[in-house]
């Protein structure tokens, strides 16, 4: 996440949803990790959904080492992304690139297609 996204997200988590109790993320380094840390500071319950490759020969290198309140079993990335979207009431996406490809975009686009309330913050 860029600094503007971080500032915005922390404010939204802290003040935007007073009834917010739990958050879900994909357990990757970078944005998921930062999101998890914000949620932890705000004493929100954290749910981690680690992803794995469908190819057993591929090692996942971008998994964050996080102590979530709830950690779900690994699922292939695209399946995991849909699970995260299906599980939440609101999906917040903060892509780090202007490209419309990758896991963040896959999850965001799935949420849009399925009518999930979503926010995209560039």
Predicted regions mapped to residue ranges:
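Acidic/glycine-enriched connector segments
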Residues: 1-122
